Design a protein with these regions (language model features):
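Conserved SAM-binding loop
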Residues: 45-46, 96, 145, 170, ...
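Short hydrophobic/aromatic beta-strand immediately N-terminal to the Walker A/P-loop
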Residues: 64-66, 95
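Residue-level signature of catalytic and energy-coupling elements of molecular machines
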Residues: 38, 50, 65, 81, ...
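The conserved Walker
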Residues: 67-71
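Interdomain coupling/hinge region of P-loop NTPase helicase/AAA+ cores
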Residues: 115, 123-126, 162-174, 178-237
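N-terminal intrinsically disordered, low-complexity tails of helicases
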Residues: 1-61, 237
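Walker A/P-loop NTP-binding motif
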Residues: 54-61, 74-89, 112-114
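Conserved nucleic-acid-binding Ia/Ib motif block in the N-terminal RecA-like helicase ATPase lobe
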Residues: 90-157, 165-168, 223-226
Length: 240
């Protein structure tokens, strides 16, 4: 069973999202249990970043999302991430990297809300400062980890996580992770994903090292850009 939309479907979906207002525009693309959960969460309208990113992520595209904090980025990648998970497979399928433990906890909580009615999906935040043995025990059966690069690397070195079924990697606030000295960890993690997968990178700014990461680890990435003031709606190829 494919958990990704076909190219024709995503093109139609993008046009439909642009033509409609509110979350009804993406509901046909989602599992009914996800729709139920996000409606309970109070979703009525899509933010510009959600409007642009969700259809492309559902189709399996790589994207570069340039947007400030507070623009709805977590749901923009969280809804497709939950949609892609196969609940019957109790192995790691998605890795989400965040710069701090606070952001990891916050993002994990939102993903759990989105997955509320998708029984069998397990989301776990991983970060430094936790008891490592308890964290290792908690990793059993987890399909999504949301963590800081250093702690994710720690688990990779310990071989307490396996990457063979990972099909989605998200870098949230990539510029902040860069500023905190996580570039090497980010690149090592991305370089260790063995199979075909999609990569979504979100960043408020696009310094040269971030662009170097996108050039190295993404393929034909879509740029989803939300201006800080006017929240313009653009979606173009990286090389356009």
């Amino acid at each position: 069973m494919s958990y990704f939309l076909e190219n024709e479907e995503v093109n139609e979906a993008v046009e439909e999202v642009k033509a409609q207002d509110g979350i009804a525009s993406i509901e046909p693309l989602l599992d009914n249990r996800i729709v139920r959960a996000i409606r309970e969460m109070g979703f009525e309208k899509l933010s510009p970043i959600q409007e642009q990113a969700i259809p492309y992520l559902l189709q399996g595209e790589d994207i570069i999302g340039q947007a400030q904090t507070g623009t709805g980025k977590t749901a923009a990648f969280g809804i497709p991430a939950i949609q892609h998970i196969n609940p019957d497979v109790k192995k790691l399928q998605t890795i989400i990297l965040c710069p701090t433990r606070e952001l990891a906890i916050q993002a994990a909580e939102e993903l759990r809300k989105i997955a509320k009615y998708m029984h069998g999906i397990k989301v776990l935040p991983v970060y430094g400062g936790q008891d490592i043995s308890r964290q290792i025990a908690g990793l059993r059966g987890v399909q999504i980890i949301v963590g800081t690069p250093g702690r994710v690397m720690d688990h990779m070195r310990r071989r307490t996580i396996k990457l063979d079924l990972v099909n989605m990697v998200v870098l949230d606030e990539a510029d902040e992770m860069l500023n905190m000295g996580f570039r090497e960890d980010m690149e090592l993690i991305l370089g260790q994903i063995p199979g075909e997968h999609q990569t979504a990178l979100f960043s408020a700014t696009m310094p040269k090292p971030i662009l170097e990461i996108t050039d190295r680890f993404q393929k034909d990435a879509k740029i989803v850009k939300v201006a800080a003031k006017e929240l313009d709606r653009k979606s173009t190829r990286l090389n356009s």
